[in-house]
């Protein structure tokens, strides 16, 4: 999908500034999949390419909700340059491959909204590579495991968004598990209001959530986690390195949160990323919480005009059934 004429003109000026050399923008196409920001591939007249991230309200398919702009909530939407740059800097410092930044514009020099132009990595994402050639994906998975280990080893004494914690701030809640429980209860209420199957099981799901949370023991150090590191959020560069994208939600949190998401998204392909020492009580709580989140979130997104509706409805349906399976007698 091409951008609006006004957006294209803004991207043209930014692309010239980012890439230099007298180049002119020849084409700009929105890349499918982005739901919180506009992601455009920019093609210049000499075939040089780059990616533009545009954090504009018109590019965000998610309905607004109270607390969206409260960055002390680790799960508030990851929007804007401040979060992106803080996450990018932390991952680079840890040796995790991310797209190189070519230009940032937070002052409206090119666009009224926050804008970043970054390196284009036009090859496959990890999910496509795993489906096409598992043997070729094996070394990429091994390197991804190394990146995850570097993130796991870097600890902070408090949890929250990297931009907040690295800036000396603190986050709401008493602990990771309390924040997750509160969020899961909200997701449960929202899903129950939209689907009678969840409504019928609401009391049992709430009882299970509270019981699992009560089993979690306190923790005082937190690792770096991406939070949504599915195979579509890992690109593969020309030499086979995994490249993390959609990094704005990067936070210090329980590492189990990351591994639950990886298990859900990768299924059997998760095995090369398995690690020892994960807390089984946290894994149990976070698994149910994420199943509820992946039910309520897609149903909420479908209230708007998100284009890939069939896929999003399928995600909600699958995770709804998985959540119910977790309380089956």
Which ranges hold each PLM region?
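ATP/Mg2+ or Mg2+-diphosphate-binding catalytic cores
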Residues: 190-200, 294-329
């Amino acid at each position: 999908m091409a951008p609006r004429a006004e957006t294209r003109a803004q991207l043209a000026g930014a692309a010239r500034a980012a890439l230099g050399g007298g180049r002119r923008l020849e084409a700009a196409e929105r890349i499918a999949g982005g739901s919180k920001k506009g992601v455009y591939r920019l093609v210049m007249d000499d075939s040089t390419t780059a990616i533009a991230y545009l954090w504009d309200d018109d590019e965000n398919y998610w309905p607004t909700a109270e607390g969206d702009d409260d960055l002390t909530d680790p799960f508030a939407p990851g929007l804007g340059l401040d979060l992106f740059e803080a996450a990018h800097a932390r991952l680079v410092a840890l040796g995790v491959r991310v797209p190189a930044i070519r230009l940032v514009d937070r002052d409206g020099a090119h666009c009224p909204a926050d804008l970043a132009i970054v390196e284009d990595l036009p090859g496959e994402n990890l999910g496509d590579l795993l489906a096409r050639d598992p043997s070729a994906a094996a070394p990429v998975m091994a390197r991804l495991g190394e990146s995850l280990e570097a993130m796991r080893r870097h600890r902070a004494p408090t949890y929250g968004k990297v931009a907040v914690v690295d800036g000396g701030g603190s986050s709401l809640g008493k602990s990771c598990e309390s924040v997750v429980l509160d969020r899961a209860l909200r997701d449960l209420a929202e899903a129950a209001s939209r689907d009678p199957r969840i409504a019928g099981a609401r009391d049992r799901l709430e009882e299970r959530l509270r019981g699992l949370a009560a089993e979690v023991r306190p923790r005082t150090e937190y690792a770096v986690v991406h939070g949504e590191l599915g195979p579509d959020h890992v690109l593969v560069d020309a030499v086979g390195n995994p490249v993390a994208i959609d990094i704005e939600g990067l936070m210090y949190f329980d590492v189990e949160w990351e591994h639950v998401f990886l298990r859900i998204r990768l299924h059997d392909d998760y095995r090369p990323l398995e690690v020892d020492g994960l807390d089984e009580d946290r894994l149990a709580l976070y698994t149910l919480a994420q199943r509820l989140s992946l039910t309520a979130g897609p149903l909420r997104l479908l209230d708007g005009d998100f284009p890939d509706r069939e896929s999003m409805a399928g995600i909600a349906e699958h995770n709804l059934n998985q959540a119910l399976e977790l309380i089956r007698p």
